[in-house]
């Protein structure tokens, strides 16, 4: 019997790097909402009293970027007396956006391999490799450690926003360690929560008393509600439970650490449980395959698992800049597939169109901001881009595709042929 512990982490929306991801995606939303053909590569940096957006934009949209940035920072919770050195109203906002390189644009506008099909005309915005993953550990078909870490982080933000724990401040991190036996989760080994807070907590100022108070409150108002509907729940007697291990966490957010877009790519995806191609998502329009193809790879992997063709599936895609069709497609089922990896790969090539133009069209990636009141990508920028029951994400909706894959497998069995 194999037994091991796997750990994943998440961060709250007030973490400096996540502030940047949300600002970058708010810029993307605003531009696409006005001009769905906008080309965007927006990077954000924050530090004490400063937020700067930079990168490349080609768009007909007219956006008040300074006002937009301040609104995002304020919505997260950095405003007023509790802002702690990073206030939405008073922080400096710098805008340094240029136009996209025409050398890049020509390959995206007119793919090298197009042959009359309009979807062939949209080339990949860059070369690269992307991975998608799914497994049957949770209802959303995500690995349990990252799913739990996100649940805790979302709940931590919720009890701050609704005033349940009014001493909490925006910055925070969660981490969950899960025990596996024979590749199945059997026990929650450790829960770690680090959360920013006011210097005084419910009238307490002694560091140990403050820490104890926060620990008890978080177990009651964060851990228990976040795990209430799960079959595998933390046992306080046996689960190692750590809160603010350094003792206190008063100075946080951009006052404590600088933040950058794209520095939480493992939090954004599968918590390290699957491989990652290295490309970040936030601030990038759908022609950037770092984003759109990673969404498609998740869609493929989730459909394979939902169809019962594998208990675990990892899909690798690769692209060349200016070329529409993927350079390569590979499926790995880690021995859990009903058929071989080669047959699963053939099935994917037969049933999925993974050209950038087709991905963009299927998921309506250019129209999503305008279809959702001007805000879509920003909501993916915190608490993960995959396995989000709180969001209506098109790449998570695999019901019809899973049904067609099931039928294809049934037809194969009936005919006695390989896929």
Curated annotation (Swiss-Prot):
Reaction it catalyzes: L-methionine + ATP + H2O = S-adenosyl-L-methionine + phosphate + diphosphate
Region forming the signal peptide: none
GO molecular function, one term: magnesium ion binding
Sites where the protein binds Mg(2+): 17
Region (Flexible loop): 100-110
Pathway recorded for this protein: Amino-acid biosynthesis; S-adenosyl-L-methionine biosynthesis; S-adenosyl-L-methionine from L-methionine: step 1/1
Residue positions binding ATP: 15, 171-173, 248-249, 257, 263-264, 280, 284
BP-aspect Gene Ontology terms: one-carbon metabolic process; S-adenosylmethionine biosynthetic process
Record: residues binding K(+): 43
Residues annotated as binding L-methionine: 56, 100, 257, 288
Oligomer and partners: Homotetramer; dimer of dimers.
Family stated for the protein in its record: Belongs to the AdoMet synthase family.
Protein name per Swiss-Prot or TrEMBL: S-adenosylmethionine synthase
Organism for this UniProt entry: Synechococcus sp. (strain CC9311)
């Amino acid at each position: 019997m194999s037994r091991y512990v796997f750990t994943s982490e998440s961060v709250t929306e007030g973490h400096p790097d996540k502030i940047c991801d949300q600002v970058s995606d708010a810029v993307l939303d605003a531009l696409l909402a006005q001009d769905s053909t906008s080309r965007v590569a927006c990077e954000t940096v924050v530090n004490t009293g400063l937020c700067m957006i930079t990168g490349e934009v080609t768009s007909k949209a007219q956006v008040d970027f300074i006002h937009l940035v301040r609104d995002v920072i304020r919505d997260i919770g950095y405003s007023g007396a509790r802002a702690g050195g990073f206030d939405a109203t008073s922080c400096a906002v710098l805008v340094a956006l240029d136009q996209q390189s025409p050398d890049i644009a020509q390959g995206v506008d007119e793919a090298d391999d197009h042959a009359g099909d309009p979807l062939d005309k949209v080339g990949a915005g860059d070369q690269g490799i992307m991975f998608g993953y799914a497994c049957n550990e949770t209802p959303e078909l995500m690995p349990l450690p990252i799913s739990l870490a996100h649940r805790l982080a979302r709940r931590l933000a919720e009890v701050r926003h609704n005033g349940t724990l009014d001493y909490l401040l925006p910055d925070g991190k969660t981490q969950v360690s899960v025990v596996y036996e024979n590749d199945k989760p059997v026990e929650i080994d450790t829960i770690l929560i680090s959360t920013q807070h006011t210097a005084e907590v419910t009238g307490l100022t002694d560091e140990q008393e403050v820490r104890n108070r926060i620990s008890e409150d978080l177990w009651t108002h964060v851990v228990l509600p976040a795990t209430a509907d799960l079959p595998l729940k933390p046992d306080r007697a046996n689960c190692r439970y750590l809160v603010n291990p350094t003792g206190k966490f008063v100075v946080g957010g951009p006052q404590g650490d600088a933040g950058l877009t794209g520095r939480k790519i493992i939090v954004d995806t599968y918590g390290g449980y699957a491989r990652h191609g290295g490309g970040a998502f936030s601030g990038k329009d759908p022609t950037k395959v770092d984003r759109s193809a990673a969404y498609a790879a998740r869609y493929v992997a989730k459909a394979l698992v939902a169809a019962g063709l594998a208990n675990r599936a990892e899909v690798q895609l690769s692209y060349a800049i200016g070329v529409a069709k993927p350079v390569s497609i590979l499926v790995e089922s880690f021995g859990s597939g009903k058929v071989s990896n080669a047959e699963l790969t053939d099935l994917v090539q037969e049933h999925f169109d993974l050209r950038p133009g087709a991905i963009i069209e299927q998921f309506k990636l250019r129209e999503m901001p305008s279809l959702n009141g001007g805000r879509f990508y920003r909501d993916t920028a915190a608490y993960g881009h995959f396995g989000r029951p709180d969001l209506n994400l098109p790449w998570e909706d695999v019901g019809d595709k899973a049904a067609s894959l099931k039928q294809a497998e049934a037809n194969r069995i009936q005919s006695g042929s390989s896929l």
